[in-house]
Amino acid sequence: EVKLVESGGDLVKPGGSLRLSCVASGFTFSSNGMSWVRQDPGEGLQWVADISSSGQTYYADAVKGRFSISRDNAKNTLYLQMEDLRVEDTAVYYCATEGDIEIPRYFGQGTIVTVSS
């Protein structure tokens, strides 16, 4: 059974920072690309960042230069370092597998990030 468990969400003031974590199990983490996506209140899912199995990273324009995705294959853990947070970064953040023939796209339960003064 594929399981993704996010943590690290919190209430933070604008300009603050957070690090989200996602512990994966039930599949070969090191062989799969991973993503962070987010959902604003009342909105659809928005892609945030991807990291390939080899460690290449890709970012949405809205977070480029402020967020950093990384992975620790020894710990089966995905990270999202978030700096200079803005009110518009408020959302539920989900980690997700890269979906392909071998493993469909799975999501975690999400962790809530609220940016407010």
From Swiss-Prot:
It comes from the Eukaryota. GO terms for cellular component: extracellular region; immunoglobulin complex. Keywords: Adaptive immunity, Immunity, Immunoglobulin. One of its GO terms (biological process) is immunoglobulin mediated immune response. One of its GO terms (molecular function) is antigen binding. Residues 1-116 form the Ig-like domain. The keyword Calcium does not apply. InterPro entries: Ig-like_dom, Ig-like_dom_sf, Ig-like_fold, Ig_sub, Ig_V-set, IgHV. PANTHER family: IMMUNOGLOBULIN HEAVY CHAIN (PTHR23266). This mu chain was isolated from a myeloma protein. This is Ig heavy chain V region MOO. It comes from Canis lupus familiaris.
